[in-house]
Amino acid sequence: MLQNMKCVLGLFMLCLLACTENKYAGIPEKYHALLDQALVKAGDNATELTAALKNAPDNQKEGMAFLIAYMPERDLKELTADFLLENTAYAYQAREKYVWAREIPDTVFLNDVLPYVSLNETREGWRKEFYERFGKYVQHCKTIFEAIDSVNRNVRDEVLVDYNTKREKPDQSPFESMRQHMASCTGLSILLTDAFRAVGIPSRVAGTPNWHDERGNHNWTEVWADGNWYFTEFYFPGQLNNAWFFADAGKAVKNDQQKAIYASSFKPTGTYFPLVWDENIRYVPAANVTDFYTDLYKSHLETISADGNHVPLRIMMFTDNACVQNSEDRVAANLDIFCGDSVLYGVPASDPDS
């Protein structure tokens, strides 16, 4: 009797194991438990997600599993199989077509090319259209840097969107911005990030909830190339790591949640991207990348200090024209230094390091 019970139990375990393996056939085991949890959270929409996993081609199954395993709960309950299958298909198509995309590590591709979203924007099927729109700008590019340059230089004229405070909302999706022909810095950054991703260039949105001198938030775009991240913006500054906000970013405060700099992630990181338009949203993962900007800016200052073409400048603001040089008569004021229309520096005059 005992021997028979052991046989029955053994057969049951084998059947259970077979069912589990068949359920996630072709998907790495590291995703299985995560997918189980995701499908429970999905509720009635689990059938759509299961269909997406089942119908994804073998070479795209890990990508589909990655998206479903790590997507926020709102997406688990709403996204359709067709939406996910199209997004994944065109992401892998770009990876197969472009030489730089084929060289991207899997971890970078999954987290910074494959995702259909950057922040909390409306979920849209932008990838197919953007693959076609921006493919023409990179078809003759031989390196990822050439491709980045080409997309960045042409994105504005391709989508006909400009910065405008009259836009409907700050966190617009690509098509919402294109319909209005206007967007916030966040909307522009999402547009550019999606344009890069559509042609196999890893990209993410970066930004700060508040500049070091209390001037408010700003968001921009980062791109990955040859093992490193670089920053740029919708209005191409001419070269990477050289946008108008560089000086401000260089003064960010890592341990101040409101004045640190964050870069978006699809996979959870233990940190969230602070969204100033809805501070209750905590489901957008992020990395605190403040050190990258402050270290880069420090190196930049050391370089220009040694080149013989720059001189130190000290500016103080006073309460009246008596200009008494003591701390009681100094006042705090924001200081912006321009060269034409470009902001070279932006610091508070009361900053002891300015």
Regions found by a protein language model. Name each.
Residues 144-147, 198-204, 226-228:
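Loop/turn elements at helix/coil->beta-strand transitions in domains of secreted/extracellular proteins
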